[in-house]
């Protein structure tokens, strides 16, 4: 693999960025510096850490950055569920983003498992 851009998990995480940014347009202004800001950072962290990890020299480093991306995925997923609970998003409007979160999480877990055998 020559580029992180070829990784399907990175491509899916970029789709997630777009889906979350579209969802965030529904947040009230009072959440601009709270949930909005936290969710933007969390969703951007996912493809960023996948890319950074893929660019590192060793499998151990890649696993480290994939673990950070996985943590950001869990953080984002929790924040989306909070938004649903507070009535900011409907379950239906968040369905695409939550589905991508599940898919990305499974891919990251699989990559970590495969890379860990090389350590």
Protein language model annotation of sequence segments:
Residues 1-119:
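Short, C-terminally biased terminal segments at protein or domain edges
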């Amino acid at each position: 693999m020559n580029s992180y851009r070829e990784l399907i998990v990175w491509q899916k995480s970029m789709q997630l960025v777009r889906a979350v940014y579209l969802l965030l347009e529904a947040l009230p202004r009072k959440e601009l510096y709270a949930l909005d800001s936290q969710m933007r950072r969390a969703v951007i962290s996912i493809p960023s850490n996948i890319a950074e990890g893929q660019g590192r020299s060793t499998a151990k480093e890649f696993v480290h950055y994939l673990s950070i991306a996985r943590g950001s995925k869990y953080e984002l997923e929790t924040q989306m569920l909070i938004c649903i609970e507070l009535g900011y998003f409907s379950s239906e409007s968040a369905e695409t983003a939550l589905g991508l979160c599940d898919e990305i999480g499974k891919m990251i877990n699989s990559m970590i498992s495969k890379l860990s055998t090389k350590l």
